[in-house]
Amino acid sequence: ASDVYKRQETDFVAKNEIFQTFVQQIADQALASSLVGGKDGEDVEALLGENGLKEELVDKTATIGEKLSFRRFEKVTGDVVVDYLHGNGRIGVIVAGNGASDDAAKEALKNVAMQIAAMNPQYISRADISADAMAKLKEITVDSALNAPDTLPKPILNKLIAKAVDGVWSAEDVAIYEEKKSNMNFLFNFLSKEAKAQLAELAMADKDAIVADKIFSGLVEGRISKQVKEISLLDQVYVKAEDGKQTVAKYLESVNKDLKIVKFVRFEVGEGMEKKNEDFAAEVAKQMNV
């Protein structure tokens, strides 16, 4: 199966028969080609060079009267391949699995495709996350924690506050601290924005020492683990889980222990463009009757 992301400027064009026919032509060529594509636009120019597609793209742009661009495509193969379109084609998902191809496997992969549409995982499993990606995730998590000092472990926070009180905070914020320090849970409700920003600056300045702290390290690892569960498909909680805990991996295992997902592709209208944040998860879950 092949999935193609084609961009146009208006919804009117998306419903245009000429446009739709051309998109199908690209999809057919992608399927026939030896090129495999990729999520970052790999092989797009090479595919456009096949069978006159580049010239067709120019011609269709002139005919329709709007700029058309072909951004990416991906090919998916497996013992069983299922697709799912959500929201009149706003989101498209293709999932490929190996190890089983009966009706139960197809139904399971269809459910997983709906899960992918709703929850937008980035990887099949945590094993697919590269060392570089994990390092970047850790860096972001560390900086996020340091820039939210109210969430830091108390021993670290207390050291930062001691520095802030000693000549960094304004007299007003120092007075607030002295008044509220007996109940630190409410301190940040009263501190000024400047005082909070100054604490974050102190934390970033002392980053190396804080990162070396075992308590902080545990906090970061916990947050990373939570994020990995959100971006790894098999680690996500299955949206139809009756107990609210069953993971996608456990769901597939309950259907057929040999059924394995080998690839999935998720395309969404407007990817790479500014768009409103919409609760697709709730919408898809409703369709799944959960």
Spans of model-derived segments:
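N-terminal assembly/interaction segments in proteins that build large macromolecular machines
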Residues: 2-3, 7-290
